[in-house]
């Protein structure tokens, strides 16, 4: 069975549909929790605001403007977002930190048109090779990023964080096998959870230029480029990282080529204090909803709107993840188990109860 449709189907206690776990299913848990409360108890002891938008996958280009325009109506004591996951089956988790994101593209231009390599090879620059050389120099095979100043401000995990990730049933070999790899890569002096959550990264997301079709075409391309994402951690300044990246690229483009550097996205890493009253209420809610203590984890991905809520709106944000890591978001057979769906509803209802008491 393969389901890529927006229409859902149910099989063996699992709902399959595009958006089942990312993010319609998780959103629905909070709506149904409020509905169940009103049907069984009556008035909800909190003022709830539901903010639903459909542009998250393209960077939410209008969301910040909308929130600022309606700032007074949307101001809240706490924001609850469900766009993360549990650590694994029967392992509920509260995410207290997200990496930031700086996304860049650079485009190298040589001649004013594609050229024949037999006629012009040896006397004109090849943008493909310029881009390849710059990309190769950015990051070593050991996983170390070579851009000077890139690691400025990066701090190791605190002692309590080490204790938390050491609780996790983390198995490098199993994860590598699941991904079809002989082993995990990266900075081997750091354990995998640290590389995944506490260390910044640089990844080339795409490269283009020249001829990539079937067969041969002896072309020297006029232009070539690369798209690069950098996941940042607390202590790194996204604007500063973007400046360092641009300087690194420009210093390495030869005089016989031109370069354009484009900045697409800059958002800082976020850490939510685990002793915040809303986080403490969330721990109790997960304990009641899932029947076990939630793990405290970080997330290697980025949710830029969280940084906006925290830094601009001054609203603490709590990340409730009810899905599973293998729920296939954005892919065929995206899914959400009904068991986790129902536990998510219960957890959301318990949070309303516990947080309303804590907030007075």
Task: Show where each model-derived region lies.
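Short glycine/serine- and small hydrophobic-enriched flexible loop segments
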Residues: 32-39, 133-137, 230, 350-353
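Alpha-helix capping and helix-loop boundary segments enriched in small/acidic/polar residues
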Residues: 18-25, 57-58, 93-94, 119-122, ...
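Residue-level recognition of well-ordered beta-strand positions that form the cores
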Residues: 105-109, 137, 207, 227-231
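An extended, acidic, His-containing surface patch that forms the Zn2+-binding/catalytic region
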Residues: 88-89, 146-223, 231-244, 252, ...
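A short core secondary-structure module
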Residues: 65, 121-142
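Histidine/acidic-residue-rich, glycine-tolerant segments that coordinate divalent metal ions
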Residues: 45-126
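Short small-residue beta-strand/loop micro-motif enriched in glycine and branched aliphatics
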Residues: 15-17, 112-118, 213-214, 329-331
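Active-site metal-coordination/substrate-binding segment of hydrolases
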Residues: 1-49, 343
